[in-house]
Amino acid sequence: MDSSKKLLFPDQILSSRRNILTRFGLGIAASFLLLTLLSLTSSSFNVPFVSPLLQGLKSSNLNNSSSVKQVNEKPEVVNLTDKVPDVKVPSFVVPDAGSKNTTLSEESKVPSFDSGQRSGETVKNSSLAEEGNGSVADDQNTLEANATTSVGNSSSLVSDLGGRFVVPANTSKENGSVTEDRSRGSYEDCDIYDGSWVRADDETMPYYPPGSCPYIDRDFNCHANGRPDDAYVKWRWQPNGCDIPRLNGTDFLEKLRGKKLVFVGDSINRNMWESLICILRHSLKDKKRVYEISGRREFKKKGFYAFRFEDYNCTVDFVGSPFFVRESSFKGVNGTTLETLRLDMMDKTTSMYRDADILIFNTGHWWTHDKTKLGENYYQEGNVVYPRLKVLEAYKRALITWAKWVDKNIDRSQTHIVFRGYSVTHFRGGPWNSGGQCHKETEPIFNTSYLAKYPSKMKALEYILRDTMKTPVIYMNISRLTDFRKDGHPSIYRMVYRTEKEKREAVSHQDCSHWCLPGVPDTWNQLLYVSLLKAGLASKW
């Protein structure tokens, strides 16, 4: 009996253990079920007291996939317009991480948009450009080749097939061509000498038909001398930042009514003077009312020439004075007489033009000749003749003498002073007297790398105009715009040749300094007209 009872005790214990385990298992299952329900509930309602636990579970479960998440996740796009609502912001495309073709260069500097102002930094290899108006330009207006910049007109340069073509700030590009938007800036605030030559395919050029003007010197009358092509008269000058008006001959004459306009300088200024005479004459119905007061039709000899426009009671004159200063002579110690140039005295011709209403000066062409270039026993100041003086230094001293004379003798309230810059020559293969040529040139230069360096004489002139003179001067900086026009010179077409020998001799002595008429000087006169219009905004001329 006892033994049977003893045998039953373990069964009782096991039975009780089974009960306990069963109850414990049910408790664990209930707890787990409760936690599961709470987990689902907390994900929807953010129950605070279970968050730490769930967060730990999540972190342990996602640990191995976090690096993949970082690679595939797109970076945040910052909306710049929220910070600067008044500034036009370009559309930035933020690439996926790891993209090879759309990453920004490390050298790129994004303009600062703080307070609506930009830092002025340049964005390299991007489409940002400064327009000077507080906005970011469209990429079509930021075309720039070889890091060239255009001064003062907010335009860019684009190099295409070796040519220099100007894309103004308001343009559109269609099929690789440039289409002008006519909403350009005003010429009143524009650098009219910064631009390019454009083909004029209509009837606007030239200003007068070739062969129609009887007052063109034979040396400039390329059409009459047999030049076979006429493309050189079909180019017009287009400033980068604005459009300029054509020279209105009758309007010009109306503004000259009762006045005297005088060109003073060398034969290049005579070239320009003859051009203006022909343009103004062509605008009149009765051309017999225009005449040279002495009846002359050739003007090569140094002197004074005046054309009278009878209906307007005005004259347009030319005074030959290639140096401004006086050509003189000096007796040496041994009795020899030296031809000299008095750098400290004005030419005697000043009495012919000091009363003019508009004066257009130029000098430079004769300073390249052998006598002036060598400068040996030629330049004189006072009683001193310099054994040797560099031509650029002599040129500066002559200009200072001219500037002092203008300041002392010209009434700035009555007279406009204009200085036309140096006209570039195009002799290839040698200088003018040693076989230099420009024959068979039929197009302008388009590749700017072929242009000459800016003339040092013009740098000297600009310094004197800016820092020495008191009288305001309208400076016509035509050096660069003429440098493009290698096609515009008379070359061998300076006369009608009667024999083959004359033709052969002409080839070795070509004129690549002066200009055919009609031709490039017509554009100078258009720019003169526009310059005077600009000056007339402040004072009536």
From Swiss-Prot:
A GO CC annotation given for this chain: membrane
Predominant place of localization: membrane
Biased composition annotated in UniProt, kind: Polar residues: 114-128
Ranges annotated as spanning the membrane: 20-42
Keyword Transcription regulation applies: no
Encoding gene per record: TBL2
Subcellular localization(s) per the UniProt record: Membrane
Motif (DCXHWCLPGXXDXWN motif): 511-525
One MF term in the entry's GO annotations: O-acetyltransferase activity
Keywords: Membrane, Signal-anchor, Transmembrane, Transmembrane helix
Annotated spans, Disordered: 91-141
Matches recorded under InterPro entries: TBL, TBL_C, TBL_N
Family to which this protein belongs: Belongs to the PC-esterase family. TBL subfamily.
Protein name: Protein trichome birefringence-like 2
Pfam families, sorted: PC-Esterase (PF13839), PMR5N (PF14416)
Function: May act as a bridging protein that binds pectin and other cell wall polysaccharides. Probably involved in maintaining esterification of pectins. May be involved in the specific O-acetylation of cell wall polymers.
Keyword Transmembrane helix: yes
Motif (GDS motif): 265-267
Tissue: Not expressed in trichomes.
Membrane topology: Single-pass type II membrane protein
Organism this protein belongs to: Arabidopsis thaliana
Other comments on record: Contains 2 motifs that are conserved in esterases, but it is unlikely that this protein belongs to the catalytically active pectin esterases.
